[in-house]
């Protein structure tokens, strides 16, 4: 997997807690939204987030890291890591289909690892996502296709 790390910041600058309500007993929640949106703000949540940007460009802020994004950008944001994607738009502009994302409960991933030992390598990915993982190349393309 081709990924780069961003680093975390102390909780004193953590932003607002976003409460994500799963659909029923679902362990995974998929959603999409445009930009600007009330959901696009500096925030954190206990769920792991896999996030695809479909349109526009700008800056991903995750922890104390800052990284440019373009369409096709895919990032994995760890549990309770403050984050936001800021698009470069002109006043009045709207990106109707910018974001596709998936929220996963970390405990679900750990239960999966307990049930299927061959997935134990995913624990390393969970740890690395605490500083955000950004995918590039074929990894980003394949992950993006799975999200949509």
Which stretches of residues belong to each language-model region?
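Generic protein-terminus/edge-of-domain signal
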Residues: 1-74, 81
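A hydrophobic/aromatic-rich effector-binding and dimerization subdomain
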Residues: 2-12, 17-26, 78-147
């Amino acid at each position: 997997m081709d990924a780069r790390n961003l680093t975390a910041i102390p909780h004193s600058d953590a932003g607002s807690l976003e409460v994500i309500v799963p659909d029923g007993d679902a362990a995974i929640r998929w959603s999409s939204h445009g930009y600007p949106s009330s959901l696009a703000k500096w925030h954190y949540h206990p769920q792991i987030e896999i996030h695809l940007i479909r349109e526009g460009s700008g800056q991903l802020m995750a922890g104390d890291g800052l990284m440019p994004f373009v369409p096709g950008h895919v990032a994995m944001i760890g549990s309770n890591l403050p984050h936001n994607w800021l698009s470069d738009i002109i006043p009045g502009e709207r990106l109707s289909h910018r974001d596709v994302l998936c929220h996963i409960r970390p405990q679900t991933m750990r239960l999966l690892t307990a049930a299927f030992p061959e997935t134990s390598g995913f624990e390393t990915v969970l740890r690395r996502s605490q500083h955000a993982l950004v995918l590039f190349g074929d990894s980003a393309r394949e992950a993006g296709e799975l999200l949509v």
